[in-house]
């Protein structure tokens, strides 16, 4: 299903960023939260891999844009994820960098937020 592919794309990107940016002896976190906000189901997926460079954050949903080595990334995963959420599911997908606290420790990383309209 397309929605599962979106979630897997985001989680796999977070995993890759964690492996690249966080040493083996540090916490590697991917936190997923689901909640309702107004008439939307909101799904937040965040990691502690130090965030997306602010110089490129506005480009990551563009087709063929990748920061990975050519053998690892095609640059279409996040583009297709955005297309699925916005065009097929009539939702919204955003990315931002965020600070958060988990188990009394402070972290910084990328946060992908999916808004999906729901009927009440």
Residue ranges and their predicted role:
Residues 3-4:
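A residue-level detector for a conserved hydrophobic packing site
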Residues 13-18:
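Short helix-loop "hinge" at the ATP-lid/N-box region of the Bergerat-fold HATPase_c
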Residues 25-39:
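Short beta-strand/loop element within the Bergerat-fold HATPase_c
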Residues 47:
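Acidic ATP/Mg2+-coordinating residue in the GHKL
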Residues 52-64:
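Short conserved segment of the HATPase_c
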Residues 80-90:
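Conserved glycine-/histidine-rich ATP-lid loop and adjacent helix of the Bergerat-fold HATPase_c
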Residues 89-103:
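Glycine-rich ATP-binding loops of the HATPase_c
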């Amino acid at each position: 299903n397309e929605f599962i592919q979106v979630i897997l794309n985001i989680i796999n990107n977070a995993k890759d960023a964690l492996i690249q940016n966080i040493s083996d002896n540090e916490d590697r976190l991917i936190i997923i939260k689901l909640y309702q906000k107004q008439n939307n189901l909101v799904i937040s997926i965040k990691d502690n891999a130090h965030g997306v460079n602010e110089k490129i954050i506005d480009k990551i949903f563009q087709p063929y844009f990748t920061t990975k080595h050519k053998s690892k990334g095609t640059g279409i995963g996040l583009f297709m994820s955005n297309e699925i959420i916005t065009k097929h599911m009539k939702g919204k997908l955003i990315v931002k960098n965020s600070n958060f606290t988990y188990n009394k420790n402070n972290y910084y990383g990328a946060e992908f937020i999916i808004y999906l309209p729901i009927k009440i």
